């Protein structure tokens, strides 16, 4: 894969370049295409799957390797693997206009897919299609931010779409099983976090089936654990308040 020419040059092909400017100098690393995003999102954890070589360059396309003294001056070390990690995490990915356009289009689709998966029409309780969400995103002129995760941007899109259409995050259906002694008192504390109580069953234990906003799940879970000292249980029944067989809303 690598052809060594003079000792300070390494030739590489099919490269994604990540660049960082430091101490007035330019430093670059050579990565495999489509691997940088995986590393930054935490999906890819094996550095060797991301880097084509652990060398630090001043110019990847020309194969010019950075000098040891320049690395020490800029990074305080000549440990090239550690420097590669810094550049990989904080550097700027160099892509062609065509590649950038393709990446932004893919991110746009990914954001729309997340929104469609997480949301429903509050009146019909039915989900929207990805195509309809994409159309709505274009109508509000949503601009993809390449340095923010698709999940973060999906939340932004939901907020903006709420101003233009009937949309809300799908409710999460939960079942609580609580000790009777603490159950009634705990139910009052849970009420502000519950959207709808679908059923209550008082027997040897208090069993409640309800709908909540997914954003409240952690708070509900922690409250039950704390108040029941681990004796209560929480079960996720479904992630969407949608009946099986509902058609998607075009």
UniProtKB/Swiss-Prot annotation:
Query: Which keywords does this Swiss-Prot/TrEMBL entry list?
Result: Acetylation, Cytoplasm, Cytoskeleton, Nucleus, Phosphoprotein, Ribosome biogenesis
What's any GO biological process attached to this entry?
inner cell mass cell proliferation
GO MF terms here are:
microtubule binding; ribosome binding; rRNA binding
Task: Tell me which residues bear Phosphoserine.
Answer: 238
Could you name the domain of life of the organism this protein comes from? Eukaryota
Quaternary assembly: Associates with the 60S ribosomal subunit. Interacts with NPM1, RPA1 and PRKDC. May interact with NIP7. Interacts with CLN3.
Q: What does this protein do?
A: Required for the assembly of mature ribosomes and ribosome biogenesis. Together with EFL1, triggers the GTP-dependent release of EIF6 from 60S pre-ribosomes in the cytoplasm, thereby activating ribosomes for translation competence by allowing 80S ribosome assembly and facilitating EIF6 recycling to the nucleus, where it is required for 60S rRNA processing and nuclear export. Required for normal levels of protein synthesis. May play a role in cellular stress resistance. May play a role in cellular response to DNA damage. May play a role in cell proliferation.
Q: What is this protein called?
A: Ribosome maturation protein SBDS
Which species is the source of this protein?
Bos taurus (Bovine)
């Amino acid at each position: 894969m690598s052809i060594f020419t003079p000792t300070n040059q390494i030739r590489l092909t099919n490269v994604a370049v990540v660049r960082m400017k430091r101490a007035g100098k330019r430093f670059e690393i050579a990565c495999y295409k489509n691997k940088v995003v995986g590393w930054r999102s935490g999906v890819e954890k094996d550095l060797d799957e991301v880097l084509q070589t652990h060398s630090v360059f001043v110019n990847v396309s020309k194969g010019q390797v950075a000098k040891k003294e320049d690395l020490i001056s800029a990074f305080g070390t000549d440990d090239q693997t550690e420097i590669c990690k810094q550049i990989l995490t904080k550097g700027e990915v160099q892509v062609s206009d065509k590649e950038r356009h393709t990446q932004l289009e893919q991110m746009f689709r990914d954001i729309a897919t997340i929104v469609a998966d997480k949301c429903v029409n509050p009146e019909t309780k039915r989900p929207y299609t990805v195509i309809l969400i994409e159309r709505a995103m274009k109508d509000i002129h949503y601009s993809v931010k390449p340095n923010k995760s698709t999940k973060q941007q999906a939340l932004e899109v939901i907020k903006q779409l709420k101003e233009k259409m009937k949309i809300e995050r799908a409710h999460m259906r939960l079942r609580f099983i609580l000790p009777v002694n603490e159950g009634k008192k705990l139910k009052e504390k849970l009420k502000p976090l519950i959207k709808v109580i679908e059923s209550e069953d008082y027997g040897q234990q208090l069993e409640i089936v309800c709908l909540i906003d997914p954003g409240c799940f952690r708070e509900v879970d922690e409250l039950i654990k704390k108040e029941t000292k681990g004796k209560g249980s929480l079960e996720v029944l479904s992630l969407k308040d949608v009946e099986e067989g509902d058609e998607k809303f075009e």
